[in-house]
Structures are given as C-alpha cells and as structure tokens.
Amino acid sequence: FWALSGGWRISNETFLRDVRWVNDLKVRLGYGVTGNNGFGNGYTTRMYKANDMWPTNGIWQPGYGSVRNVNPDLKWEEKSELNFGLDFSLFDDRLWGKFDIYHRKVDDMLYEVNAPMPPMVHDTVMKNIGSLENKGWEFELGGDIVRSKNFRYTSSLRLSHNKSKIKRLGDDGYFLDQVTFPSPGNPGTAVRLQNDVEIGQFFVYKYA
C-alpha cells in the first residue's frame, strides 16, 4: 500500500507577503491506498474446538468441531482516497479554518454473509463481496471572540456533508438486510445494502 501528498503554503509567496490580514494560507492534495484485514483468526484457516455436540446418524454426539466456516480466498479490503484541503488563518490569527473535499472508494469489502448448510458447517461465511463509494466535504471555522492579556474566549463551527453508496454487491437485485424492525410479529427489515443505493435508506411499504 502507498500514499502521496503535497502542500503549497501560498502565504509564503511574494505576491501575498504584503497582504497583512492573511497570516497563513495553504492548499493540500493527497492520494493513498490503505488495507484492512479486519477479520479474526479462523476465517482463512480451519480451527477446531472440543466439547461441541454434532449430529451423527440422527444422534447428537460430543466431539471436536469447526469454529467457523473458512474462506481460503479472503484478501485485504482496499480503500483508496483522494483529498483536497485548504487551511487558512486571518486577521492576526483571530479567524481560522479549514475545508476538505474527499472521495473514497473501498474495494473487496469484507462482510459476513449467509452460507448454505450443507455443505457449510455454519450458517455464515466471511467474503470479499463488493465495493463502496464515499464522498463529501468538511468545513471548520473558528475565531477569537475575546482576546486579552489574561483572558481568551474562542468559538468554532463545524459543517459536513457525506454520501455513501454501494457500487457493487454481487449480482443485480442482490441485497443484504441490515436493520430489523423492533415491532412484535417479525415485520421484517427496514434497511438493506443494495447496488447503487445510498447506505441508510429505508425500505418500507407505502401507504396512501
């Protein structure tokens, strides 16, 4: 995995040195790829434990059993991110802030999905199942409301906007249930992961 970033402190340039109200002005640009192997032991190599009960010829017998289903084809989840930022400090450092725009993409997402029994021993298995896109912006603005020799009072404001969307998740029409209704009677799930659908959207019945 690798990353590359750079910055330009514009306030050090000759065309801004005489602009007294600009104390600091900098732009940043970065791109990098990181990995996540967020799964524990036993997902790629079979592990066993004792004192389990397993059906044999219709009778439950004590013995050794597999801890979980294994997937020898598991690989790192990869996240790539492009980020552009602006930092500034103005009016004798009384007003400061920063602004960031980012675009992230996660490929080979790790997720535990349902598995058929048999041939699997357990009902779930960890897989690399798809890709996720995440983009948005963040803005922070702060300043000195009061500044004196013995007292200083500051305030800040933070704003952000983010969109996350599943770009690929198996075949068209495939989805994964996420959040179940708490009502009695098993009414089903309210949130799901699905191709080209923003994360967090509700899937419910429409009533007139």
Regions found by a protein language model. Give the residues of each.
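Extracellular/periplasmic, surface-exposed regions of secreted and cell-surface proteins
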Residues: 1-197
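Short, intrinsically disordered, charge-balanced linker/junction segments flanking boundaries
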Residues: 201-208
